[in-house]
Amino acid sequence: MALDPVRLEIFKSLYSSVAEEMGITLRRSAFSPNIKERRDYSCAVFNKGGSLIAQGDHMPVHLGSMPMSVQAALQIADPGPGDVIVLNDPYAGGTHLPDVTMVAGVYPEAQARPQPSAARRKRPLFYVANRAHHSDIGGATPGSMGLAEDIYQEGLRIPPVRLMVGGIVNTDLMRLISANVRLPAEREGDLTAQLGAIATGRVRLARRRR
């Protein structure tokens, strides 16, 4: 079956606009100049298999490796409805530790709220993800960008874990992150902005499926 170039361009613009709007939410909600002014962030949309299908006009270094972080999140944490996975692990598709990634599934409206375990195993329609450069993630040097002999000196390394479970923020994990970084209030603000960008992506994709 031949591809219709008109339909292809329509769908490309449709899904790319979701990633762009996620980026707008993130930039306007963030606390740190790294995100608000330097615009050191990226947002993207993935299909139900975790393959990249659309991205915003953001940071190539983020977008090139983000699919590996999404695959790691799906394999290790398997986000269900209302879940958001956070990670910054370079061994799971991350870039450097200050770049924090969030991944979440977009489910049909009937499954958008937390469901019993059988429903949680159903595949989502899409995944949405964003990555943002935090101005500090702990470690020996302010800004987490100093010379280091191993990754443990660089800062807090976060494997794929749930920052939001069934629509509820995991406050224990948020406190753990805040206790290991400089300017914890700013870090919490930027993480919350990333959660807001995820919510924007979910809402926009759900509306486009109606």
Regions found by a protein language model. Give the residues of each.
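Short, basic, low-complexity termini and linkers enriched in Ser/Thr/Gly/Pro
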Residues: 110-121
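Short, small/polar residue-rich loop motifs at catalytic or cofactor-binding pockets
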Residues: 37-40, 100
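N-terminal leader/propeptide and maturation segments of large enzyme subunits in energy/redox metabolism
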Residues: 2-10, 157-210
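A short, hydrophobic, proline-anchored segment that marks a local hinge/packing element in signaling
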Residues: 99-109, 129
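Short, basic/aromatic recognition patches
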Residues: 14-38, 74-75, 86-95
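Regulatory sensory and allosteric helical modules in signal-transduction proteins
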Residues: 48-55, 67-89
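Gly/Pro-rich active-site capping loops and adjacent beta-alpha segments
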Residues: 123-180
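A short, polar/charged loop-to-alpha-helix boundary motif
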Residues: 61-73, 135-144
